[in-house]
Amino acid sequence: MKFSIYLIISLFSSFSHAIWLDTNNETTIREDCNIIAKGLLDYYEGTKYGGVIGMFSWPYYWWEAGGAWGSLIDYTFYFDNDTLVPLITDALLYQTGDDDNYIPLNQSTTEGNDDQAFWGIAVMAAAERNFTNPKDPTKAWLTLAQAVFNTMQARWDTETCNGGLRWQIFQWNSGYDYKNSVSNGALFHLAARLARYTGNDSYVVWAERVWDWMYGVGLLTEQNWWFVYDGVKIANNCSNITKYQWSYNQGLMLAGCAYLYNYTEEEKWYNYTIKLLESAQVFFKNISGSMVMYEAACQPSNSCNNDQRSFKAYFSRFLGLTSVLVPQTEPVITKWLVDSANGAAGSCSGGSDGVTCGLSWTDWSQGWDGKWGLGEQMSALEVMQNLMVHKRPAPYTADTGGSSIGNPAAGYGKLTSDATPLSIDGGDKAGAGIITAIIGASLVGSCVWLIL
């Protein structure tokens, strides 16, 4: 389906050269998110001559495109706005790859586990938000999310460090000798969401396996503050930890625990949620009593790269989800989001249009900081639209109105089977029925403030 970006832009409401936010007024939140979403789509190349459907302009990589579509799925949900549905659907389906598992040929030489995971998280959100279902049931949102999970868990590497996912999928890519929190945290996160949606406890088993490995190797540290470190080199049995902390890693683990507590009601997942939330304070700067989000490992040194400039987007999204799934967290998270949204609104005053969003939200009285990009737009959109998270239903499940059809064996295509199968039980259902199958396959296979 071809869908004109110019038509999309024309459907956005008109705006003046400023963003004014009243966090208690749904109309201003909607209008501001409308403006910011339009700015986000200015970076989209998929409807332009020579562009690739689903991809944003250089220098934004494939994984960040998956993150951006996840943001726009929530945008359509929070504001009950179906304007972007055809555009988002085309993007999500075009990039699935021949085996419908988000390993497309155009990314086969560079794709990492974390890259694939962010597309999986996007389609998982589509299932949970009852986003318009694809006409082809074999490409249902839940099925695609299961395909990503299945192909990721098949790469679980017990030959080094007693488990864990490598950062990279393919041996020729730099980072194949690194096991990082974003890849493993995303597997944990997807497992938690699939467990809650399908009711299949085999996903809980996988979530626990990933959690225990990350804890055992030292990527998760249990102290007064619960740190989530960036990753480990496989040399010396993964004993050399890279002690950077990134907000999106904290968010992946936090929301994953929240999903598991909401589903299992096990006290340990509640306790982990609270501890991770307490330690998330490191990603907020106290500005005269306002707690404003920032990327602590790179913003103070003005060294955030294009990827890192989008991390606050996913962190905001995962905070919003946590506040819904574990209501006890709502007061703290709401204050953080409100304070940060005010800061973000102050930063969205740059560019030739007067509404381009910047990176820094902590100096909003100074306005735009001169930085711009897909990550800046996405982050501002997410922190503002998550002010609406309690105005709309919680993420749906197969038992509470979710209509996406699942396939527990999705994603393997023609691959041979020799991996430990995922147990399928009667609870693994989606939409109209239960699909049972045996899964089996294998694939080839970043301080409290900065660094401790």
Curated annotation (Swiss-Prot):
It is an enzyme of class 3 (hydrolase). A lipid is attached at G431 (GPI-anchor amidated glycine). Keywords: Cell membrane, Cell wall biogenesis/degradation, Glycoprotein, Glycosidase, GPI-anchor, Hydrolase, Lipoprotein, Membrane, Signal. Residues 432-452 form a propeptide. Induction: Induced by HAP43 and up-regulated in absence of CYR1. GO terms for molecular function: mannan endo-1,6-alpha-mannosidase activity. Glycans are attached at N25, N81, N106, N130, N200, N237, N240, N262, N271, N286. InterPro entries: 6-hairpin_glycosidase_sf (IPR008928), Glyco_hydro_76 (IPR005198), Mannan-1_6-alpha_mannosidase (IPR014480). It is a lipid-anchor; GPI-anchor. It is found in: Cell membrane. GO terms for biological process: budding cell bud growth; carbohydrate catabolic process; cell wall organization; fungal-type cell wall biogenesis; regulation of filamentous growth. Residues 1-18 form the signal peptide. Its EC number is 3.2.1.101. It holds the Pfam family Glyco_hydro_76. SUPFAM superfamilies: Six-hairpin glycosidases (SSF48208). GO terms for cellular component: plasma membrane; side of membrane. It catalyses: Random hydrolysis of (1->6)-alpha-D-mannosidic linkages in unbranched (1->6)-mannans. Probable mannosidase required for normal synthesis of the cell wall. Belongs to the glycosyl hydrolase 76 family. This is Mannan endo-1,6-alpha-mannosidase DCW1. It comes from Candida albicans (strain SC5314 / ATCC MYA-2876). The gene is DCW1.
